[in-house]
């Protein structure tokens, strides 16, 4: 088994940033791809080549090798390499070995992602897996799709991507935040809570999630007795906490980011902190809130949900990822990355071409409505025999909508028990579908 990995190095990106169309090609472990043409254009890049397929399926990765999310990169890179290895061991795609181009997305403080996307497109990537951060994807999505290349994120959850004008070329294995709202409502209802005081950032993110939660909880027979929006720069939550105290609601739900720590500390000061009064959060605040409060005891009892796969149950997968990268046991978005590549490869085989728009037309159906299968080799055998397939991935059954996103996903229910991080002994995993 061979894997041709082509690394888009920092030196190549720096050269392309400085020299325009005279950019040096990326460093490779095989035949060098075409010389890259770079651009500073933010939204579209009409001078980049239009991908019409060349018979060889190529995957580019847009992962945070540098920047604030760089801790995620090893597991993402290792899972991508594992997917390519599994595909090539099963015979490749369209009778050819799959190519892997590895690139850095950086973070939103840099223009690294734009430069990397230029390299990935000119190198012949048929699908770009990434980015992780929604704001990074927002910066590059138009450049990718106007070059007739598929973008497939393992992590983006912004609801706005559902109806984005993407020419049918954007997909994600991560669920929309709106699916998370339904899971949170289910958990609160299961816990016997019937009335909720709901606080949320008055941003597009906060309002969309608050509306979705309100609808889901109401459909379950619950009642949102208070809706308490606040500006994202709020630091004083005294007035909001006082309304919650007087509301009579039997629980509070917080939809926000790091500022949630100040809200919870204020609630605790009124005697209605999570240790005595049920308080729930979402993926944007739950995993880190224990490190942001003055004393972890303040968040004892805090409960939240986040999209996550129980990788403790995927020992063989995580072991193979560890063989390819130093993950330190951190596998966030690794199953979703693996699945994005497998789904794309199967869609390419079914399409009979690596021309991205033809591949994209097959992606949704790979995840729904056929004979269930869970490995590339098994699914490929079924597809070759003429069967419609339904890929059941490491991250879940997916069941993509026509918009190219999951209707089924795995979520982790996290609970704090006095420490600065959620108590893993109290973790639950639920499948929403």
Region spans (language model):
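C-terminal motif of bacterial Sec signal peptides marking the signal peptidase cleavage site
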Residues: 14-17
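Extracytosolic ligand-binding ectodomains
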Residues: 2-7, 19-433
């Amino acid at each position: 088994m061979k894997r041709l990995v082509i690394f888009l190095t920092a030196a190549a990106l720096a050269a392309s940033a400085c020299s325009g169309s005279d950019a040096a090609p990326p460093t490779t472990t095989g035949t060098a791809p075409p010389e890259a043409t770079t651009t500073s254009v933010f939204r579209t890049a009409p001078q980049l080549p239009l991908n019409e397929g060349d018979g060889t399926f190529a995957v580019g990765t847009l992962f945070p090798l540098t920047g604030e999310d760089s801790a995620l990169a090893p597991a993402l890179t290792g899972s991508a390499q594992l997917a390519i290895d599994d595909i090539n061991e099963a015979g490749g795609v369209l009778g050819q070995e799959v190519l892997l181009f590895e690139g850095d997305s950086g973070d939103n403080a840099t223009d690294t992602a734009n430069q990397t996307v230029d390299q990935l497109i000119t190198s012949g990537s048929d699908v770009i897996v990434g980015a992780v951060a929604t704001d990074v994807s927002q910066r590059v999505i138009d450049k990718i799709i106007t070059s007739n290349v598929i973008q497939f994120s393992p992590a983006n959850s912004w609801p706005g991507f559902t109806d984005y004008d993407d020419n049918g070329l954007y997909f994600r294995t991560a669920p929309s935040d709106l699916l998370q709202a339904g899971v949170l409502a289910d958990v609160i209802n299961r816990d016997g809570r019937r009335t909720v005081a709901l606080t949320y950032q008055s941003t597009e993110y906060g309002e969309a999630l608050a509306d979705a939660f309100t609808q889901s909880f109401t459909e379950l027979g619950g009642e949102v007795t208070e809706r308490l929006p606040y500006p994202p720069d709020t630091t004083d939550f005294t007035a909001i906490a006082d309304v919650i105290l007087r509301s009579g609601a039997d629980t509070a739900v917080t939809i926000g980011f790091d500022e949630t720590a100040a809200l919870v500390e204020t609630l605790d000061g009124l005697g209605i902190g999570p240790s005595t009064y049920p308080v729930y959060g979402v993926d944007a605040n739950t995993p880190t809130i224990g490190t942001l409060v003055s004393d972890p005891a303040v968040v004892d009892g805090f409960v939240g949900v986040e999209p996550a796969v129980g990788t403790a149950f995927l020992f063989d997968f995580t072991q193979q990822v560890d063989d390819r990268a130093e993950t330190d046991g951190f596998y966030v978005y690794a199953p979703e990355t693996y699945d994005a590549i497998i789904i794309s490869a199967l869609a390419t085989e079914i399409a009979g071409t690596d021309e991205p728009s033809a591949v994209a037309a097959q992606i949704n159906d790979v995840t729904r409505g056929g004979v269930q299968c869970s490995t590339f080799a098994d699914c490929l055998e079924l597809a070759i025999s003429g069967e419609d397939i339904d890929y059941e991935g490491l991250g879940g059954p997916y069941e993509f909508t026509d918009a190219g996103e999951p209707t089924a996903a795995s979520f982790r229910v996290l609970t704090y028990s006095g420490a600065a991080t959620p108590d893993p002994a109290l973790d639950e995993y639920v499948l929403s579908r």
